[in-house]
């Protein structure tokens, strides 16, 4: 039997941070179309474009994220990207212009791309090499659990808290 531990404080922190990252992502994903339609009165095509800006930005930053993580200290890059990712949620609430919302969406995607690559890299650094596959499996499980509950809770909160549909 292998005595290399997976469950360490560092692993628990990165696992919890990964769950919260994806939970936040999936929490707002199903309600953003409603928000964009109601706040900016735009059509489905524009909503689709705005939502895709996030993913495209995340895709564009990932190759550069790997280089940055190999060149600079990983933990500070991870924490800065995570902070930006979190702060952008507040920006969505105060964005009164559609162009500002789109810009926030792009920055949010960059932060998401950076923090996911950084999280995966840090995970590999902290796992014992003999149990990396198992540790990565648990780490990925956090994404799936967030995917299972995030959209449901987001839509529930939207239905519960949004009052303009009550008329």
Model-predicted regions and their roles:
Residues 76-90:
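Structural signature of the two symmetry-related core transmembrane helices
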Residues 10-40, 47:
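Helix-loop boundary and gating motifs at the non-cytosolic
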Residues 106-141:
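Cytoplasmic helix-loop-helix junction between adjacent transmembrane helices
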Residues 99-107:
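Paired small-residue
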Residues 55-63, 147-148:
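Residue-level signature of mid-helix packing/kink "hotspots" within the transmembrane helices
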Residues 41, 73, 94-99:
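Helix-breaking motifs and short loop linkers at transmembrane-helix boundaries and internal kinks
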Residues 62-73:
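Helix-to-loop junctions at the C-terminal end of transmembrane segments
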Residues 162-167:
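Conserved small/polar residues in nucleotide/adenosyl-binding loops
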């Amino acid at each position: 039997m292998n005595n290399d531990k997976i469950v360490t404080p560092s692993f628990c922190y990165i696992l919890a941070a990964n769950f919260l990252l994806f939970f936040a992502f999936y929490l707002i994903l199903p309600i953003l179309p409603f928000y964009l339609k109601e706040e900016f009165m735009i059509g489905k095509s524009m909503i689709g474009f705005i939502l895709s800006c996030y993913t495209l930005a995340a895709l564009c930053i990932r190759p550069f994220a790997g280089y940055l993580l190999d060149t600079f200290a990983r933990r500070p890059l991870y924490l800065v990207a995570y902070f930006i990712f979190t702060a952008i949620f507040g920006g969505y609430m105060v964005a009164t212009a559609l162009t500002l919302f789109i810009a926030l969406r792009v920055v949010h995607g960059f932060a998401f791309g950076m923090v996911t690559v950084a999280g995966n890299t840090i995970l590999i650094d902290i796992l014992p090499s003999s149990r990396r596959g198992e540790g990565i499996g648990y780490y990925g499980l956090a994404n799936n659990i967030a995917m299972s509950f995030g959209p449901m809770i987001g839509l529930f909160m939207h239905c519960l808290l949004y009052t303009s549909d009550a008329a």
